[in-house]
């Protein structure tokens, strides 16, 4: 796994999640259901922090209750607890980090700033997307310092920023000290992600295509400079080709829809893809979870599970979540419209995150499960938008 050309050398950012699951294995053995129950705990904490974020943004119990209802009603996030990857743990650390950032405007600013950085740093270790949140946070801290001239706060920002910048080198030296043959600087994933993010793949526009990394290692061996040059050249060629063929708008329409107009945000895909990547044999233990029963002999799910995953029950869930998705986006839009003239830093932070990530993923390799974070962060905004819209409707009827 750790040797050159293998998983970790290609994806060094996955080291923390590998170590995380090693830790779970040490505690629980290879009991995958125990891992999924850990995800359930994280899920409850995600709900908790989304509600806390809502209470900071609005300080209205009705809006907090609406946020809780939105959390519970999004079935696909509950499905994600079966997906043993970094998604659910990272969502927890991200929501906690955002809460402590917003809370530093109200009480114990230094303590909450430090907690926010710690939680978001943990989130970045598990999911690199959280770096965007850290950058947004640092920008707002700098703007705050310009207004307040608070030396203690800016010192925390400076120290944290330096640590974030140096963290890749720290990780590289730590891993290299364990095995001198490993050098994480040889990773070319940035270039690979840009190539895939600007080209069509078998799964979707801008998605991970599965062929480019093996091609690079076969073509260039250990010559990482040549790999990087190939990646940059292909990215430029991809964009030029899309423009020349008048397919740029079509490409980004497909990519954006697959990321943001995806009702279950790949919730069901993540737990079924392993079973039937090419409609072939799968590993039943990789997606079993209590009531999901699997017929090992015939390689089929039970009738209920099959209906839940791909049948009529699934169709009803997707239909319902499609309606929910429209409510979420419309509610968030109402929030922006109703608060446009009284936007404080607290109220603008989550929209700023959404916009920043949207722009980042225009070029970067992406798919629906990457954007689920930004989707659930809209819940507190949607709750306030719905409540404000209801007030307007009631007042107009009087």
Feature map (PLM): residue ranges:
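Extracytoplasmic catalytic/substrate-binding loops of multi-pass membrane glycan-assembly enzymes
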Residues: 1-20, 29-33, 184, 227-228
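Membrane-proximal stem/loop segments at transmembrane-domain junctions that anchor or position
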Residues: 2-3, 177-294
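Membrane-interface anchor segments at the N-terminal boundary of transmembrane helices
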Residues: 34, 38-39, 254-354
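Transmembrane-helix motifs of polytopic, lipid-linked glycan transferases
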Residues: 37-58, 96, 331-334
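Transmembrane-helix signature of polytopic, membrane-embedded enzymes
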Residues: 50-73, 345-348
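Short acidic/glycine- and proline-prone juxtamembrane loop motifs at membrane-interface regions
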Residues: 79-90
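Membrane-interface transmembrane helices that cradle and orient dolichyl/undecaprenyl
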Residues: 95-113
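Membrane-interface alpha helices of multi-pass inner-membrane proteins
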Residues: 112-127, 161-167, 359
């Amino acid at each position: 796994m750790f040797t050159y050309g293998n998983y970790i050398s290609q994806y060094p950012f996955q080291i923390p999640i590998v170590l995380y699951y090693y830790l779970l294995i040490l505690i629980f053995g290879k009991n995958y259901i125990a891992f999924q129950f850990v995800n359930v705990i994280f899920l409850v904490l995600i709900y908790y922090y989304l509600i806390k974020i809502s209470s900071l943004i609005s300080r209205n119990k009705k809006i907090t209750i609406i946020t809780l209802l939105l959390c519970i009603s999004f079935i696909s996030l509950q499905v994600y607890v079966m997906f043993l990857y970094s998604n659910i743990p990272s969502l927890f650390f991200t929501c906690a980090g955002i809460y402590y950032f917003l809370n530093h405007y109200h009480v114990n600013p230094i303590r909450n700033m430090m907690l926010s950085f710690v939680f978001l740093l943990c989130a970045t270790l598990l999911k690199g997307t959280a770096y965007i949140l850290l950058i947004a946070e640092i920008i707002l801290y700098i703007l705050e310092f310009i207004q307040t001239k608070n030396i203690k706060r800016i010192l925390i920002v400076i120290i944290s920023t330096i640590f974030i910048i140096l963290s890749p080198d720290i990780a590289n030296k730590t891993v290299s000290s364990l095995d001198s043959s490993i050098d994480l600087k040889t990773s070319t994933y940035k270039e690979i992600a840009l190539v895939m993010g600007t080209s069509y793949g078998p799964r979707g526009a801008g998605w991970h295509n599965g062929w480019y990394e093996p091609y690079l290692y076969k073509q260039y061996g250990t010559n990482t400079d040549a790999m990087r040059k190939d990646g940059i050249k292909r990215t430029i060629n991809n964009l030029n080709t899309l423009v020349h063929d008048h397919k740029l708008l079509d490409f980004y329409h497909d990519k954006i829809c697959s990321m943001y107009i995806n009702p279950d945000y790949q919730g069901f895909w993540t737990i079924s893809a392993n079973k039937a990547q090419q409609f072939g044999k799968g590993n039943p233990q990789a997606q079993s979870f209590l009531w999901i029963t699997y017929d090992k002999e015939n390689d089929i799910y039970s009738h209920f599970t099959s209906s839940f995953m791909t049948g009529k029950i699934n169709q009803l869930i997707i239909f319902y979540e499609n309606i929910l998705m429209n409510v979420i986006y419309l509610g968030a839009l109402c929030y922006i419209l109703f608060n446009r003239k009284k936007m404080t830093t607290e109220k603008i932070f989550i929209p700023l995150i959404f916009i920043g990530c949207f722009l980042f993923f225009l070029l970067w390799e992406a798919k629906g499960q990457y954007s689920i974070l930004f989707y659930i962060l809209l819940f507190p905004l949607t709750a306030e938008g719905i409540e404000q819209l209801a007030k307007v409707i009631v007042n107009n009827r009087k």
